[in-house]
């Protein structure tokens, strides 16, 4: 038999050095073949004095090859019991019934391998470790099964309240009902009214971009008439009218696609287990990918032909935890599976049916069932007690819900300005020259990119987030809801700054419609962040600063470095160009530079994480750490004193 060390049968016997041993012989007894007390003790239980590189004990094969026997015999034919009393240190390995059984049945133990780290590797930091000076918590391993219990990225729970039914009215229109949001029909007509007007166009011309989705009579446009249905949101009494038409181009707003995903997320996150047999689930019936962000952010919504005819819903699973059902709630379903609301929606939207009347029936059933659980308090009780305010929702699922809600607002108040979000002559001359060589003068960081930043920088409800060059406010609003942070943005161009102000108002209305808890301390400012009066105060408070400086000239990056000197210890700077030169080493000539107080790491972003290109790239996270410079100054002072 070959082992790791070669032919096991030809291994020489290891030398056992024993300082003193006492052997007591007892009366001969018939050796038992099994049992915890049968057979003599193993010689390997004696702890020998040997070097660390040798094997412990004597291999069984070596004793059977004619090795001179000393002390008690290990042969299975031995007729005497031997008891060894060791005067040296006791064995560190406790004896178990298996270790005291017959030596003939013992298998050779595999020696333990000890991993020795080099001095250089023990003090090194990975790119993620460099963001936090505190050591990472070690992985927890279940001893019984050896299963690694560290959750996968996105599978951790949020751990804070994200649903706030009790604060919906406080963030509404102060008793005026739900008349403050921009409706789906206004976007389709291209004529946004009210407080958000000015971003639309000719309604009749815009309607020519849409066509009927359902082939039945009455589901096509007739003059100003648009086929539509009203859908009830989780907030009590909040309804929105969705137009039942689809765009001719993938680049246009898709009301059917948005309605479908609205229903999917409501059925997935808001329905109590006691009523899932009525509503069903649409998650498994839609062709939606499952990354950190499961919905496209600020991009075209999938066309209805992406739907497939799915199998029926499986029976609703039992809830993971108990939820008390009120006396007025719907009784439990019978053993025979009933057709759910999700079943009707799935059938009506299937490409081989496209049944408009059936879809209207399904929406009517949904509205009636949703209104019932709103009025009897079941929905509020589920969100507050059963869901514990959403503390147990997974990070990945929460990010997808945030993305969709913000995408609704973006489509309504920013989409109409897409033709104006271009390079503007108000840029400073040096910035204009740098941007003129780019294919796209205006760019946005997409939802997946910002989700990674939130995870990587550990943004939370106690954090302050500042975005220098915030555009239309996407990242500012995402940090305020997804992380619950206080968020502030500063944008130079007037059109993106105007869109940001519109989007803040629309997004906060959407939070209320979905009963979501976001941080209302959100501000977006228009002006040059180098001279704006609010920038200095917000930077001194900031925990995370984001700056998209990919097209900034070197002079502007130098101005930013001077501004960042006021950042507090431990603050993080996320940028697309580094503030620490490659190969930077602190010395007497550069110890006063901004790079001397930074710990910088490079990371990759992936395709479609930015709007201006479909390729991957690099971004950088720098942490303010003045201790490195202090240590360098102390070492320089020590050298100077020794020279004297």
UniProtKB/Swiss-Prot annotation:
InterPro entries: Dot1, DOT1_dom, H3-K79_meTrfase, SAM-dependent_MTases_sf. Residues 131-146 have a biased composition (Basic and acidic residues). S-adenosyl-L-methionine binds at residues 442-445, 465-474, 491, 528-529. GO terms for cellular component: chromosome, telomeric region; nucleosome; nucleus. It comes from the Eukaryota. One of its GO terms (biological process) is methylation. Residues 93-103 have a biased composition (Polar residues). It catalyses: L-lysyl(79)-[histone H3] + 3 S-adenosyl-L-methionine = N(6),N(6),N(6)-trimethyl-L-lysyl(79)-[histone H3] + 3 S-adenosyl-L-homocysteine + 3 H(+). GO terms for molecular function: histone binding; histone H3K79 trimethyltransferase activity. Its EC number is 2.1.1.360. Ubiquitination of histone H2B to form H2BK123ub1 is required for efficient DOT1 methyltransferase activity on histone H3. Disulfide bonds: none annotated. Gene3D superfamilies: 1.10.260.170, Vaccinia Virus protein VP39. The keyword Repeat applies. Pfam families: DOT1 (PF08123). Belongs to the class I-like SAM-binding methyltransferase superfamily. DOT1 family. This is Histone-lysine N-methyltransferase, H3 lysine-79 specific.
């Amino acid at each position: 038999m070959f082992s790791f060390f070669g032919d096991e049968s030809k291994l020489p016997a290891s030398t056992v050095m024993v300082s003193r041993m006492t052997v007591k012989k007892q009366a001969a007894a018939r050796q038992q073949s099994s049992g915890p007390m049968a057979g003599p003790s193993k010689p390997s239980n004696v702890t020998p004095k040997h070097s660390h590189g040798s094997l412990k004990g004597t291999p069984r094969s070596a004793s059977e090859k004619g090795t001179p026997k000393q002390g008690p015999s290990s042969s299975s034919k031995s007729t005497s019991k031997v008891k060894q009393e060791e005067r040296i240190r006791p064995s560190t390995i406790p004896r178990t019934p298996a270790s005291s059984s017959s030596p003939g049945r013992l298998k050779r133990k595999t020696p333990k391998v000890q991993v020795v780290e080099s001095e250089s590797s023990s003090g090194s930091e990975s790119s993620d470790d460099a963001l936090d000076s505190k050591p990472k918590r070690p992985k927890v391993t279940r001893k019984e099964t050896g299963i690694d219990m560290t959750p996968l990225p996105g599978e951790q729970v949020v751990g804070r309240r994200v649903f706030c039914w009790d604060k919906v009215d406080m963030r509404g229109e102060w008793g005026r009902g739900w008349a403050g949001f921009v409706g789906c029909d206004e976007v389709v007509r291209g004529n946004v009214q009210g407080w958000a007007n000015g971003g639309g166009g000719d309604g009749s011309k815009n309607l020519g971009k849409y066509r009927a989705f359902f082939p039945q009579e009455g589901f096509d446009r007739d003059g100003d008439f648009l086929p539509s249905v009203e859908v009830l949101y989780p907030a009590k009494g909040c309804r929105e009218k969705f137009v039942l038409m689809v765009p001719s181009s993938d680049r246009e707003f898709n009301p059917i696609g948005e309605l479908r995903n609205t229903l999917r997320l409501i059925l997935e996150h808001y329905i109590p287990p006691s009523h899932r047999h009525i509503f069903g689930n649409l998650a498994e019936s839609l062709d939606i990918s499952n990354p950190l962000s499961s919905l496209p952010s600020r991009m075209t919504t999938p066309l209805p032909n992406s739907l497939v005819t799915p199998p029926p819903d499986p029976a609703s699973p039992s809830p993971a935890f108990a939820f008390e059902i009120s006396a007025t709630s719907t009784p439990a379903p019978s053993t025979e599976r009933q057709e759910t609301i999700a079943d009707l929606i799935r059938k009506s939207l299937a490409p081989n049916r496209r049944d408009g009347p059936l879809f209207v029936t399904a929406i009517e059933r949904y509205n009636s069932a949703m209104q019932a659980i709103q009025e009897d308090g079941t929905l509020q009780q589920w969100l507050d007690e059963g869901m514990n305010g959403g503390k147990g929702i997974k990070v990945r699922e929460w990010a997808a819900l945030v993305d969709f809600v913000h995408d609704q607002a973006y489509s309504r108040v920013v989409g109409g300005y897409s033709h104006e979000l271009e390079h503007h002559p108000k840029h400073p001359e040096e910035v204009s020259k740098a941007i003129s060589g780019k294919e796209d003068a205006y760019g946005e960081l997409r939802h997946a990119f910002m989700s990674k930043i939130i995870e990587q920088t550990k943004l939370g409800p106690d954090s302050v987030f500042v975005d220098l060059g915030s555009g239309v406010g996407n990242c500012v609003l995402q940090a305020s809801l997804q992380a619950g942070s206080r968020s502030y943005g500063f944008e130079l161009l007037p059109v993106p700054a105007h869109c940001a102000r519109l989007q803040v108002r629309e997004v906060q209305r959407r939070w209320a419609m979905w009963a979501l808890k976001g941080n209302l301390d959100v501000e977006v400012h228009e002006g040059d962040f180098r001279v704006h009066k609010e920038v200095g105060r917000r930077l001194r408070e900031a925990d995370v600063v984001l700056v998209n400086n990919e097209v900034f000239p070197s002079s502007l990056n130098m101005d930013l470095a001077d501004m960042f000197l006021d950042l507090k210890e431990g603050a993080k700077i996320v940028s697309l160009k580094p503030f620490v030169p490659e190969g930077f080493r602190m010395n007497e000539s550069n110890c006063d530079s901004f790079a001397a107080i930074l710990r910088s790491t490079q990371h990759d972003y992936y395709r479609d994480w930015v709007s201006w290109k479909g390729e991957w790239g690099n971004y950088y996270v720098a942490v303010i750490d003045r201790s490195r410079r202090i240590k360098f100054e102390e070492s320089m002072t020590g050298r100077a004193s020794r020279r004297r």
